Regions:
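A non-catalytic alpha/beta surface segment that caps or lines the substrate-entry region
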Residues: 1-26
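Histidine/acidic-residue-rich, glycine-tolerant segments that coordinate divalent metal ions
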Residues: 17-21, 38-51, 57, 70-190
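Short coil/turn segments at beta-strand junctions that form active-site/ligand-binding loops
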Residues: 28-29, 72
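Histidine-anchored nucleotide/phosphate-binding helix
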Residues: 56-64
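Solvent-exposed, charged/polar functional surfaces in cytosolic regulatory/catalytic domains
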Residues: 2, 62, 160
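Short beta-strand element of the alpha/beta-hydrolase
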Residues: 30-34
């Protein structure tokens, strides 16, 4: 706020999420710095999340200091729950709510291994996929032959993706979670 940004707080359904915007009077690109923060449950700031927010906020303020001369718009989006918080990732919420639709560049910083005296870059695109499996419910003890187990299909697919990872390069990440695995052990799950 001290730097002249307009602040939206909270933003995109996240209590600690924010959107800071500074528009120059000249046309130009829209640049967003993604300020990730909030510790991971049980781990804390395990991979530098305490650094992300400050670094991106500083970068946004630095670009803002020259944007009136060069033109464009600078935004800083505060994105808590980067690896899945109570409301999911705020980055995902910014995407879903259209905050990145008119953005030319979106940048963030992530400390990690790389050259000791320099910078390295990575580009991780995110392509969320929801897979649903449908079967036929049946009592597991009384008439299992009448059921088609949707959970078995989920588990086989999950395991196959796990095996696929050994053929992928180090820079490709695939993560998954089974959000519904049935209702009771003695019922063959339909979904």
């Amino acid at each position: 706020k001290k730097e002249g940004f307009e602040i939206e707080l909270p933003a995109v359904g996240h209590r600690t999420g924010f959107a800071a915007t500074y528009k120059s009077n000249k046309p130009g690109p829209t640049v967003v710095f993604l300020a990730e923060y909030d510790a991971l449950a049980g781990l804390g700031h395990g991979c530098g999340h305490n650094v992300f927010g400050a670094t991106s906020s500083l970068a946004g303020a630095a670009l803002k200091s020259v944007v009136d001369q060069i033109g464009g718009e600078v935004r800083v989006y505060g994105t808590p729950g980067e690896e899945g918080g109570q409301n999911g990732s705020a980055k995902g919420s910014f995407v879903k709510k259209g905050y990145l639709n008119d953005v030319d560049f979106a940048l963030c910083v992530h400390p990690g291994s790389g050259p000791e005296d320099g910078l390295s870059t990575r580009n991780y695109a995110c392509a969320p996929v929801d897979i649903e499996f449908w079967g036929k419910p049946a009592h597991a003890a009384g008439c299992p032959q009448d059921g088609i187990n949707a959970l078995d299909a989920q588990i086989l697919t999950y395991a196959a993706v796990g095996v696929l990872r050994q053929q992928l390069t180090d820079r490709i990440r695939i993560h998954g979670v089974i959000v519904d695995g049935g209702t009771a052990p003695n019922v063959i799950p339909e979904y």
